[in-house]
Amino acid sequence: MAKIKRYTDISQARILDEILLSKGADMFFKCFGEETYDLTFCEVSYSEWAKDYKELYDKACIKVIPCWSLSALISLIPQEIFDGEYVINITEGSDNRWVLTYDHYENRKHSYYSLSIGADNLVDACYETINKLHKLKML
């Protein structure tokens, strides 16, 4: 039976922390050295938790990396983006894919663009979508 991925792995969490600066994180990894870590769920958002506790972990030399559950990742993906020229609609497609489409009218021609991001599971699909939107400066 396949195991369902419910949250970002440590490498995804590190990259998302650089992109999102912990925005929307609802859990965190406590890191003990390079390879040993423990996952902890926050009863409040990671940002709220960090206000009260991160300094204590820093003093104890325990590195803390924000982590995102599937529901937290989904909530970060906008349904629509307007970049000044385009309206981009983001919808959930089939096979764990998010489909980004946008319309642009230029010289009376209608152009339709589609970007499809797929992965083996929804956590990876959300991660790839957030990463791609960041690279496109749309997040």
Label each PLM-derived region with a short phrase:
Residues L20-K23, I77-E80, K132:
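Alpha-helix boundary/capping residues
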Residues S114-L139:
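Ampiphathic alpha-helical segments that act as solvent-exposed interaction surfaces
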Residues A13-I19, A72, D124-K132:
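Short, hydrophobic/amphipathic alpha-helical patches that form generic packing surfaces
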Residues M1-V64, S69:
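Charge-rich, low-complexity N-terminal segments
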Residues A2, A13, N107-R108, A119, ...:
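Small-side-chain structural scaffolding
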Residues T40-A119:
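N-terminal segment of the canonical double-stranded RNA-binding domain
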